[in-house]
UniProtKB/Swiss-Prot annotation:
Protein's UniProt name: Putative cobalt transport protein CbiM 2
Keywords on record: Cell membrane, Cobalamin biosynthesis, Cobalt, Cobalt transport, Ion transport, Membrane, Transmembrane, Transmembrane helix, Transport
Chain segments annotated as transmembrane: 9-29, 41-61, 80-100, 107-127, 135-155, 160-180, 181-201
Major place of residence: membrane
Protein source organism: Methanosphaerula palustris (strain ATCC BAA-1556 / DSM 19958 / E1-9c)
Molecular function, one GO term: cobalt ion transmembrane transporter activity
Functional pathway: Cofactor biosynthesis; adenosylcobalamin biosynthesis
Job description of the protein: Part of the energy-coupling factor (ECF) transporter complex CbiMNOQ involved in cobalt import.
UniProt-annotated location(s): Cell membrane
Length: 235
């Protein structure tokens, strides 16, 4: 979904940067508070950043002035929330723009709003709604990750349609065209990403459940049930 350098008009680049900045500020404040409380969170933050960087660098071509790929934001969103994810995602997008020519500096605001902010907010909402229910935590993780992924591309389609409305049908026609093209690759990718993140959480819960408990991601009872189910599968 990385919109390439120079593809958006300057006015829209400025708009998306202005929308992104408050989330970055809030995320930085939260990060500083977290680091003062416990610097042991740093390794997991690094893992979250690497997860986003690697998955979002796996590009599939798309004919929308962009590309399709997993976003990888689900892990950070569930563990740290969407504001911290905005900062982690912004750092990833900056490195990708400078080192991989993936996205751009002028369009970084738009890319942040879609991948580092909008998608994570949607994924976090799904996680919070399902967290305290009886639904299996791996299903919760799967859906939160998949929704964060697909909403990222809905927002990217929205951004592109605002910048380039169709001559016939205007914004809605343009939005439908952009997202229908993205959906061909992105719906399967979002499902795959959800499965991958569920497996990652299964690994963490089996080996280092105290990380999940310390961050209050899931309750001790939920983790115990998940570990018991995992042990039963092995047996």
């Amino acid at each position: 979904m990385h919109i390439m350098e120079g593809f958006l008009p300057a006015g829209w680049c400025l708009v998306w940067w202005l929308i992104a900045l408050p989330f970055l500020v809030m995320g930085i404040i939260q990060l500083r508070r977290m680091m003062k409380e416990d610097r042991e969170y740093l390794p997991l933050l690094g893992v979250c950043g690497a997860f986003i960087f690697i998955l979002s660098a796996l590009k599939l071509p798309s004919v929308t002035g962009s590309c399709s790929h997993p976003t990888g934001t689900g892990l950070s969103t569930i563990c740290f929330g969407y504001c911290v994810t905005a900062v982690v995602g912004a750092i990833v997008l900056l490195f990708q723009a400078l080192l991989l020519a993936h996205g751009g500096l002028s369009t970084m605001g738009a890319n942040m709003v879609s991948m580092a902010i909008g998608g994570p907010i949607a994924g976090y909402a799904v996680y919070k709604l399902m967290k305290d229910t009886s639904i299996n935590i791996y299903v919760t993780v799967f859906l939160a990750s998949a929704v964060a992924d697909i909403v990222t591309y809905i927002i990217t389609s929205f951004e592109l349609a605002l910048a380039y409305p169709a001559q016939v049908g205007g914004f809605l026609a343009s939005f439908s065209a952009f997202f229908s093209i993205f959906a061909i690759t992105q719906i399967p990718l979002s499902i795959m990403e959800g499965v991958v993140l569920a497996l990652v959480f299964k690994y963490i819960i089996q080996l280092k459940p105290e990380i999940i408990l310390k961050l209050h991601v899931f309750s001790e009872e939920q983790i115990a049930k998940a570990r018991l189910a995992g042990d039963a599968e092995v047996a």
